[in-house]
Design a protein with these regions (language model features):
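Short, positively charged and aromatic/hydrophobic N-terminal segments
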Residues: 23, 30, 40-44
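G-domain G4 guanine-recognition motif of GTPases
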Residues: 107, 140-142, 163-176, 194-202, ...
Length: 340
C-alpha cells in the first residue's frame, strides 16, 4: 500500500527541523514508526560527519591539568597530588561519542629541567605542540606567567586553536576573575578564554562542547571501546608512585620510579609484583620505614585503589631496589619509557 510510504516520508522530512528522537517517538505506536526510527537512525549516522583529533593539555605544575583530563574522560587516568611534577609521562585519554573521538593528552607541568629525567619530561611537552589539533593552555586564577618563555612563545604564535582555561575560579571572587581574564586576553590574544573549576566540574561542559566544534573531520584513531593507550602495568606504577608522593617528603618522591615486574590476571584476582626503584641506600631505608611499616602502608593504599580501578581483587607485592643515578642515565630512562 503506497500510503505506508507516505506515512514514513512525512516524519522523515520533519526530521531536520524537529530532531531525530522527538520525531520518531510520535510514530512509535505504529508499525511504520518502528521502521522510521530505525531507518532515520541509519540515515542520521551516515549523514553526520565523524570528527577526531588530538587535544593536548599544557601549563605550569599544579594548575589542574590532570584533574581536567580525568573530568573529561570520566576515569582516573592521571594521578593527582599537591606536589609539583606529579605527572611525568604524556598520558592519552580517549573520549568517544557516536560521531567523535577526542584524544586528550595530559602532559607534565612546565619547569626548567635540573636533570635528565626532567629534560625528558619537557620533551613530552614539546611533542604536544607537534600533533595537536586543539591546544588547552591551563592557568590557575591569580597566575600571571608561564614559567618558560620559549613555551609561552609557542602558545602565542600557535596556528592551531588555543583554548585558555582559567582554572580554580572557586578559590577567588568576581573581581580577581575579571582581572585575570583581562590579563590573559592581552597576553594571549589568539586564545579563546574560559573560566572553569575542574575540581567542581564548573564550566567544563562548555569547554568540552567547544573542543568538539573545533575537531577536524576524521575517522576514529582508536577502537571506540578503548580508554587509553597505556597498558595496565603503567597504571599500577602510577598508583604506587602517587602514594609515595603523598607520604614522603623532600627528594624521596622525585628519586623514585616504579616497575611492575609481574602482572598475572585470573578470573577473580590480579597478582602483581612491583619494585620501587630509588637512587641511594639511605632512600631505601626511608621507603621501607621502621619494621616495614611505611612500605606496608604504601602497599595497602595502592591495593585498595587498584581494586577500584580494575574491579577485581588485587594481590600486590612490593619491594625496594637501589638503581643508582637512574634519573641521569639514558639507558635507564629509556627502560622506564622516558626516552626514545
Amino acid at each position: 500500500n503506497n500510503s505506508h510510504w507516505l506515512h514514513f516520508t512525512l516524519p522523515y522530512v520533519a526530521l531536520t527541523s524537529k530532531g531525530f528522537f522527538d520525531t520518531g517517538l510520535k510514530y512509535l505506536s505504529t508499525p511504520q514508526g518502528y521502521v522510521f526510527l530505525f531507518c532515520s537512525y541509519l540515515c542520521h549516522m551516515e549523514n553526520t560527519p565523524h570528527k577526531a583529533g588530538f587535544v593536548n593539555i599544557i601549563g605550569n605544575p599544579n594548575v589542574g591539568k590532570s584533574t581536567l583530563m580525568n573530568a573529561f574522560v570520566g576515569e582516573r587516568l592521571s594521578i593527582i597530588t599537591s606536589k609539583a611534577q606529579t605527572t611525568r609521562h604524556r598520558i592519552l585519554g580517549i573520549v568517544n561519542g557516536d560521531d567523535f573521538q577526542m584524544l586528550l593528552s595530559d602532559t607534565p607541568g612546565i619547569i626548567k629541567p635540573a636533570y635528565q629525567l626532567q629534560e625528558s619530561m619537557m620533551d613530552f611537552v614539546k611533542s604536544a605542540f607537534d600533533d595537536a589539533d586543539v591546544l588547552l593552555y591551563i592557568v590557575e586564577l591569580g597566575e600571571k606567567e608561564l614559567k618558560d618563555e620559549a613555551f609561552f612563545s609557542k602558545i602565542t604564535n600557535s596556528k592551531i586553536p588555543v583554548l585558555l582555561l582559567i582554572n580554580k575560579i572557586d578559590k577567588g571572587d568576581e573581581t580577581s576573575l575579571k582581572e585575570s581574564m583581562t590579563l590573559w586576553q592581552e597576553k594571549v590574544p589568539n586564545a579563546e578564554i574560559f573560566a572553569i573549576s575542574a575540581l567542581e566540574n564548573f564550566g567544563v561542559s562548555e569547554v568540552f562542547k567547544r573542543i568538539i566544534d573545533l575537531l577536524p573531520q576524521s575517522p576514529a584513531f582508536y577502537p571506540k571501546d578503548q580508554l587509553t593507550d597505556k597498558p595496565e602495568r603503567f597504571f599500577v606504577n602510577e598508583t604506587i608512585r602517587e602514594k609515595i608522593l603523598m607520604h614522603y617528603k623532600k627528594e624521596i618522591p622525585y628519586s623514585v620510579e616504579i616497575e611492575t615486574e609481574e602482572f598475572f590476571e585470573d578470573e577473580d584476582i590480579i597478582r602483581i609484583r612491583a619494585v620501587i626503584m630509588v637512587e641511594r641506600d639511605s632512600q631505601k631505608g626511608i621507603i621501607i620505614g621502621h619494621k616495614g611499616e611505611a612500605i606496608k602502608r604504601i602497599g595497602v593504599e595502592s591495593r585498595k585503589d587498584l581494586e577500584k580501578f580494575f574491579g577485581k581483587q588485587i594481590h600486590l607485592e612490593t619491594y625496594v631496589k637501589v638503581n643508582k643515578n637512574w634519573r641521569n642515565s639514558d639507558r635507564q630512562l629509556r627502560r622506564f619509557g622516558y626516552n626514545g
